[in-house]
Amino acid sequence: MATNFLTKIFGSRNDRLLKQYRKTVARINAMEPDYEKLSDEALRGKTQEFKDRIAQGESLDALLPEAFAVVREGSKRIMKMRHFDVQLVGGMALHYGKIAEMRTGEGKTLTATLPVYLNALSGQGVHVVTVNDYLAGRDAQWMGRLYNFLGLTVGINLPQMPREEKQAAYQADITYGTNNEYGFDYLRDNMVYDARERVQRGLNYAIVDEVDSILIDEARTPLIISGQAEDHTALYVAMNKVVPLLVRQEGEADPRTGEGVTKPGDFTLDEKTHQVFLTEQGHENAERILASQGLIPEGASLYDPANITLVHHLYAALRANHLYHRDQHYVVQNGEIVIVDEFTGRLMAGRRWSEGLHQAVEAKEGVNIQAENQTLASITFQNYFRLYNKLSGMTGTADTEAYEFQEIYGLETVVIPPNRPSKRDDQLDRVYKTTREKYEAAIADIRECHERGQPVLVGTTSIENSEIIAELLNKAGLPHQVLNAKQHAREADIVAQAGRPGMITIATNMAGRGTDIVLGGNVEKAIAALEADESLSEADRAARVQELRAQWKLDHEKVTALGGLRIIATERHESRRIDNQLRGRSGRQGDPGSSRFYLSLDDQLMRIFAGDRVKAIMDRLKMPDGEAIEAGIVTRSIESAQRKVEARNFDIRKQLLEYDDVANDQRKVIYQQRNEILDAPDLGVLIDAMRDDCLADVVRQYVPAESVEEQWDLAGLEKALASDWQVSLALQKEVEGSDAITDEEILEKVQQAAREAFQAKVGQVGAENFTQFERMVLLQNFDTNWRDHLSALDYLRQGIHLRGYAQKQPKQEYKREAFELFRQLIDQVKNEVTRLMMTVQVQSSAQLDEATQAMEDRGEGISNVTYSSPTETGEVETVADAATAAQPAAAGVRVGRNDPCPCGSGKKYKQCHGKLA
């Protein structure tokens, strides 16, 4: 109550920030007449003037009003677009490291040019992060004209680009790319064997477009680079045959009474978490079936150490058969399982689920089974983006997740008011008893809109649902276009024309995101196609363009009069934010529009979270079939269910971060050490320190510290030094011929002898030649042991929750054991490097060069490298590297200079983004 009272007097934090920013907007507006008088050269010259002032110590904050005024003027001249005042406000929020929430159609791409230009003046690089390659390419080309006019360089970072082009892209003042590609480049830079092969040059400032999608939806799973592990093909096939012999249990047993099971079975499913669990009966049946098939010995337990991998494969097979469904979670295409991104509905060609799930689905569908992978490097988006000196982001829907942005990333959300208030009518949800009734009502609404010429966008949560609606529209004789994973190459064009009169467009969730739906259709695309037609004369082209513009004006007025774009959704998503994004496609920049959700009690969200409550209301009201309930209480009940899911997902992401923070601290140490090894001109000091530490451990096994002579085993020490470390010392003779010798002196003698033996080896080929060999040995040992360590951490984490049964805190146990594993890793590296350095026999520098090259080739030649990145569903999906992929169909495309540009412009790469790179 007191808080509300104070907010009324002083305004909210958001109001106060906007008030502060508007004062700066007034200063920028006051400069506009002066900048309008400048010639193009004088305006461009401002960039160098600003750089000089920064070099003399002036801050970016002090330059902000002038820099923003320059960008606005440049945009007016080059783009024929003037930044609105609210866009200047959004630009300030981004510059100050905040998240700017700007509604769809408010011009986020143009807003970003302001802080991008200002921060690029420092010369330390600005990374603009987008959700897909199409948007990265489009924005780099579109806004690149403005940056180039103002004297800044622009690069684009695409997957599978040659290293030299990637380096050029990162050296540019401004770099456009996707979140996954930035993260993978960071990991790859920490896997190189030559410092000159690194592509990134420090992480200075990032602006994340669609920040909610990248930092929240995709933050549950890490980016992973992996190589191929051993083949278990026969096991996946065998496990797939076991699954039909196991029966699903219905109902859940009460832990105290054991009651509640309506039909006993072998396993239970948890649809919320996508997990499967064997019951007591299930364990016994599984063991009996596996024994009968010869997979485990008769009478053996499923949890014997030798059978642990079988449990992993059995669970993967159960999940594949009962929780992952064809045409919803994946499609079968050209004999391969292709994952469907449930948020965007796109096909993720070449990507793979991890932990054996993908192979289990392949076995289920009877297609070729490809091998599992071993993790080479990984990082979560939370930890990658927190490496930047400054981070900001923009989206149409961030306010529902403002707490998470603040809690995890330390980012404040600023809600930017629209340039023109929204006129969209968001109608109450209509809830029907059955799916059939829901679809009938939705089709009737679509037909009504189509008959009067109002465009409709139908939003669905999966490909399966979009195909159901497409089929129903076909039966109803209503023409429509489908925008889902199966046609995503054309999605930007389809979305652009979705505002034409009478147009019906079906879209899976946010497919085609980043492209505005203009009422009356996008006339600019049609004009661009005309201008590219060389068969037309100038006069014909001008006449056709005039016709197009006149027709568009009529269409625009007609659609506006009919109420704008109508949004019809057939299911609520588990996140309110995704529903708001769908609604946000309508009513852009003050246009009219309307939206309605048609739901049924059979929908997944309703069934799991809100169905019983709404069903009780319907039963109480004695609703006849075909009648819908439409009331605020129902909509609020559904939103309450969505809040529960959002809270659960936040907890998952927060827990992921708490666990990954442990690995992150270790990752920083390893990567820092690795970079020091790559950059160091001489590694002698590091090698000497490792050898001294290592030999101290060896000596202490035979000659304990502060011990007397009777406790020493000098014969054992001499033997160990000679056989394992190639150090020959007559320690027994020395001790016998000496009156008094301490354990410390023994240690010093051993270390000195090892030092001399090593120096003699270095002397044979020269210190300079030996340094590169040392570098390869160190890097390869760090990499090999780090990979094994990542697998060990993964196994540790999978079972750590069981410590809770022993009244121990799993997170604390994980931290303690992870630290112990890391200590072992460092000791292992020291031992392996020292032993190799002491035992290697090198006769000539040519022989040494050969050995060095062989080690480098072995380190870089990991077979079938794949890149796993998250989708919004939280599952890990994997794309094969074009350079190393065993399956060409799964490989990404390397862009040749004369190939079509991947951005979809239709131009050659060298004439499009090749120029930017």
From Swiss-Prot:
Which controlled-vocabulary keywords does the entry list? ATP-binding, Cell inner membrane, Cell membrane, Cytoplasm, Membrane, Metal-binding, Nucleotide-binding, Protein transport, Translocase, Translocation, Transport, Zinc
Explain how, and how many, cofactor molecules are bound. Answer: May bind 1 zinc ion per subunit.
Q: Which GO terms describe its biological process?
A: intracellular protein transmembrane transport; protein import; protein targeting; protein transport by the Sec complex
What EC class is this?
translocase
EC number(s) from the headed UniProt entry: 7.4.2.8
Question: Which membrane topology describes this protein?
Answer: Peripheral membrane protein
Do the record's keywords include Transmembrane? Answer: no
Binding-site positions, ATP: Q87, G105, E106, G107, K108, T109, D516
Instruction: Specify whether Translocase is a keyword of the entry.
Output: yes
Q: Which cofactor does it need?
A: Zn(2+)
* Subcellular location as annotated: Cell inner membrane; Cytoplasm
Checking HAMAP family in the record gives: SecA (MF_01382)
Which protein family is it in?
Belongs to the SecA family.
List the protein's name: Protein translocase subunit SecA
